[in-house]
Regions:
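N-terminal secretion-targeting helices of virulence/extracellular proteins
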Residues: 1-177, 212, 723-724
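Non-catalytic all-alpha helical scaffold/repeat segments
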Residues: 181-721
Length: 724
């Protein structure tokens, strides 16, 4: 591909392109006028003369007159095509020139100088920012990173401009036709997009037929797709040319390239990425999307080939879509397509299952399944606002998507038919959870309940989803089971709502324990607050049982515990007081909340009582994650709270580092994570801070006693909830 230098684009005379396009408009008008004159002055008189001849001379003459008349029309068509291409080139290059000028204007305000030839330097470089980082200095310095960032922005604009220039040049060449005896071109394209979509479609169809693309053809295809993947007109025309079935066959072939190790794998992966974006871009148009999805409703439940092992259309489509820039997909498309797939699986149960057979008593390992619904949920998780809109039950509870996914859906699995001696079926069929089951669901739940930024405030929609998730996943005491792939995402969700879970577990905040009016529906029903500052308040028993199920994963438990500790430290700091009485409420609430964590942790350990290694492994991993988890879900932590939290984290990690086996680390967990010891440590750190009364103050000692009483209350509350 040809390149454009910085100074060429910066000083490009785009007005000349506009003037050229306007002149071609004049040319087209003149050809039309000449054609009309030829028709009036030659064609009509010739036809009116009624000339006939035996030797065919009249027929030949009439054909020549008609050919001449057609040339005037073709000349008009060619001129219009050239004008259209020049107008497209003008619009694109004008935009890229403006982008470059804006970048140059922004640079000085950011301490960056861009020379007339595009060289980037810092106006006043920070001497401390010159040090390269990482082992052996392999990571660029901060100053180098700044320069690289601006160089990259310039390069992206220049590359896009060069693409536009090359695209226009090729389209102009196509529009002029072959010339010579063939005359003017009557098959011109009406835009650069049309020309490029036709060329891309030809190359893609050639590849899909199994014909090998030459290096030049593959490079051109990669350029065409990369340059146009976010262009609505190109995308619609390309998909219309390929057709829905052709698109699916192509998507399957490209996925095979990804799984292989061919020499051109990276280029085909780039084409696959662009094709995914092209599908999403085309579906921004409502009329196109409605028709395209209608076709997919039929193709989605059919296999993409005659082979019974080939995937279904929806499986192929969602696999393709995962490889695009999913965060930018249009919400109407992602939500609508997900609903289409759910409607299909309700009509065709077990459509996405995998099947196998095994001898009686043989162990069968879980395998991944191609679950298009879960794929789409994972895609939506990249756009938190869309995730929330999709799952929000609404003020009236009318949206039941969350209920379907958490409570009603028969998730695809591995169906294993038992056989005797490898042949005779025994009649026994086992269902084994897929290794990747609910991965997308976990991601979309986390996005939908937490939003873009960690921690509160939460919107009413986010809080509704969190509240209903707690309720829908509730189980009877003693049966707190959460599917493994949901545990960490749910722990992240709960950690994000620590301001709510803390109050619920402490059981003393009236807004969480009594009906409270609210402005966005169903007042007091597990939800209160304002539209953009809402709180979930499910029953403490349901919350505790969910925490217990999630805590089977030690990392999940560590995430929640660390968030709770950070929140307690923040609450102590937020009082602004310097006496024991000033922090009494946060300390007592903290004791109660951590008492509940004690009960949860002890129940997990108790359930592993028959396997000492499993107990030790869980404890060791828990203390590791509690000590190592960064606190991002509790915003607004000040210096005093951070000091308290850092001291406790250092104490835990210091003890943990002193042991080199799981058994010893488990002892650290028993000691360090026991909530009475933890709260005592936090209170002592607070009391020993600047201007504080000191840990030996009698009032501080009384506060520690109150905390222990509340710890017992919180622990009992949790034990009752989980049936201990």
């Amino acid at each position: 591909m040809s390149s454009i230098a910085y100074e060429q684009l910066y000083h490009l005379d785009v007005a000349s392109l506009k003037a050229a396009a306007d002149r071609w408009n004049d040319v087209a008008r003149r050809y039309r006028q000449w054609g009309e004159g030829f028709g009036d002055g030659v064609v009509k008189p010739f036809d009116q003369a009624g000339w006939t001849s035996i030797d065919g001379t009249a027929v030949l003459a009439r054909a020549q007159v008609a050919a001449a008349e057609k040339e005037f029309g073709d000349a008009d068509t060619e001129a219009k095509g050239l004008r259209a291409v020049l107008e497209d080139a003008y619009e694109e290059l004008r935009r890229y020139k403006a982008d470059l000028h804006q970048l140059a204007a922004d640079a000085p305000r950011n301490g960056v100088r861009i020379s007339g030839t595009g060289e980037v330097s810092l106006i006043d470089p920070d001497e401390d920012g010159d040090q390269r980082r990482g082992p052996g200095g392999v990571i660029p310095s901060q100053n180098e990173e700044t320069i690289l960032r601006w160089q990259t922005r310039i390069a992206l604009i220049l590359t896009a401009a060069a693409n536009a220039d090359q695209s226009a040049a090729i389209a102009l060449k196509h529009n002029t036709g072959k010339g010579g005896d063939e005359g003017f071109n009557d098959r011109t394209v009406k835009s650069v997009d049309q020309d490029e979509s036709q060329r891309a479609a030809l190359l893609l169809k050639k590849y899909e037929r199994g014909d090998k693309l030459s290096p030049a053809e593959l490079a051109e295809l990669d350029r065409l797709m990369d340059h146009n993947q976010k262009d609505p007109e190109f995308s619609r025309m390309l998909l219309e040319d390929l057709g829905p079935e052709g698109t699916l066959r192509l998507a399957e072939d490209l996925e095979h390239e990804r799984a292989g190790d061919g020499r051109d794998k990276d280029k085909y992966n780039s084409v696959q990425h662009a094709l995914a974006n092209t599908v999403a871009t085309a579906n921004r148009d409502k009329e196109f999307s409605d028709e395209w999805r209608e076709d997919m409703r039929e193709l989605g439940v059919r296999r993409t080939g005659d082979d019974g092992s080939r995937p279904y259309g929806y499986q192929t489509l969602t696999t393709l879509l995962k490889h695009g820039d999913t965060a930018g997909y249009p919400p109407r498309f992602t939500m609508g397509l997900t609903d289409d797939i759910i409607a299909a699986e309700k009509k065709h149960p077990d459509l996405w299952n995998e099947y196998d057979q095994a001898n009686a008593g043989a162990d069968v390992d879980p395998v991944p399944v191609m679950d298009p619904v879960d794929d789409m949920l994972g895609i939506m998780s990249r756009d938190p606002d869309t995730a929330t809109a999709y799952l929000d039950p609404g003020d009236d509870g009318g949206n039941e998507r969350l209920k379907y996914l958490l409570d009603q859906r028969d998730w695809p699995d591995l169906e294993v038919r038992e056989v005797y001696r490898g042949q005779e079926p025994t009649g026994t069929v086992d269902h084994i959870d897929a290794s990747n089951t609910r991965v997308g669901l976990g991601s979309v739940l986390e996005a939908a309940t937490t939003g873009e930024e960690p921690g509160p405030p939460h919107t009413a929609g986010q809080a509704r989803i969190m509240r209903d998730t707690v309720g829908l996943l509730d189980t009877p005491p003693g049966h707190e089971e959460i599917q493994p792939n949901l545990r960490r995402p749910l722990a992240n969700c709960l950690a994000d709502y620590t301001d709510d879970t803390h109050e619920i577990l402490s059981g003393v905040q009236g807004s969480y324990t009594h009906e409270a009016p609210q402005e966005h529906g169903r007042g007091g029903d597990g939800l209160f607050g304002r539209e953009n500052d809402a709180h979930m308040s499910p029953g403490s028993d349901k919350l505790i049982r969910l925490m217990r199920g999630v805590s089977e994963d030690p990392e999940a438990y560590g995430t929640m515990h660390k968030a709770e500790t950070a929140y307690i430290a923040k609450q102590m700091e937020d009082t602004g007081g310097t006496t024991a009485d000033s922090v009494r409420e946060p300390v007592r609430k903290g004791g109660a909340a951590l008492g509940a964590y004690d009960a949860v942790r002890e129940d997990v350990v108790y359930d592993k009582r028959d396997d000492a290694n499993a107990q030790e492994d869980w404890k060791a991993k828990t203390v590791y994650h509690v000590a190592g988890t960064p606190v991002t879900m509790v915003p607004g932590i000040g210096d005093a709270a951070q000091r308290i939290l850092d001291a406790w984290t250092y104490d835990v990690s210091n003890e943990e580092k002193g042991y080199n086996n799981d058994a010893a680390a488990a002892e650290v967990a028993d000691r360090s994570l026991q909530s009475q010891r933890e709260m005592q440590f936090l209170v002592d750190e607070w009391a020993n801070g600047p201007g504080m009364p000191g840990m030996d103050d009698p009032d501080v000692n009384d506060l520690q006693l109150d905390m222990r009483n509340d710890h017992t209350t919180g622990e009992k509350l949790a034990n009752d909830a989980i049936g201990r």
